[in-house]
Structures are given as structure tokens and as C-alpha cells.
């Protein structure tokens, strides 16, 4: 398959995150390779922080897809109501959604952020592929601002003072390598 055809296919979430996309390593595989290589390729258990981050990503980049998230009006994930409504699925809590909506509003009401994110010559969720050290990698640039020649990778954190440790824990530095290489527009 030609690279252009692969990239076109990877633009579709079902392919990017499904069997087709699993032919390529991605940032989620980096931690597994570093901490438990035998678990490579096994599904990862979803965690609330990643669900919250995913909702923020979607709110900024693809707000038309927010309805795919299941939201439960509950104070915690331990309540009887949450367990009944969620059916064992990891769901967002309403107060988490409220917080993310406020964050999204703050980001988009900031002139600098809004212009970088919603400018004229912008691409969202642009996939790329590359070979590094004989391995095939995929990456997806959240935002490419061609006018400013920027690749923007959105991140969330529960505690800004601990962000540098989160960046290390989740290998954000390494994710930037495989995001920027395959999607480098310049």
C-alpha cells in the first residue's frame, strides 16, 4: 500500500486505533517497551486521567465528536448510581466534564491560544508514519499551524506543579520525536 493511502486510512479513528493501526508502534507503546515489553500489543486498561485528557482533546479538536463520551451524574466512580449506569465501562463524571468545558473555554478565549489553534492555515489530527531503527511508527499531530510553523501537542495535567514528572512518566519527550518526524511539515 502506498504511503499516501496508508495516511488517508489512518485519518479515520477506527483504522488508526484498530487492527490496521496496530501494525505501527505509537506513543502508548513506548511506556510498555520501557517498563514491560512482554505486554506489548496487549490492550491497556483505561484510566480516568486518559479519559479526561481525551475529552479535552476532543473538545478542542473535534467538538462534533463529544457525544461519543458517556457521562454520569455522580460524585465518584464508587457510587451505586455510577456502577449501575456505567455497566462496568469507564465513564466521565459530570463534574469532570464541567471542569474540561471551563478549561476549553479558557483556552479558546485566550487570544494567543485561539489564534494558534483556530488560525487560518491549520490542520488537526494529522497522522504520519515513519521508520525508526527498523520499526514502523505512527504519530498524530494534534494541531499543525502552518503559518507559525508549529506542531502543537495538547496535554492535560491534574497538578501543574507535577507536570514535569508526568511528562517524564508518560514519555512526552519521546512522543514528540515520533509525532514530529512523521508529520513534520517543514
List PLM regions with ranges.
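Metal-dependent nuclease catalytic cores that hydrolyze phosphodiester bonds in DNA/RNA
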Residues: 1-139
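Short, local alpha-helical segments
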Residues: 40-42, 162-167
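Generic preference for flexible, low-structure residues
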Residues: 72, 167-168
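Conserved catalytic cores of phosphodiester-cleaving nucleases, focusing on short active-site segments
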Residues: 139-165
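Gly/Ser/Thr-rich active-site loops/lids in small-molecule metabolic enzymes
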Residues: 168-176
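Single conserved hydrophobic/aromatic residue that forms the stacking wall/gate
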Residues: 177-178, 182-186
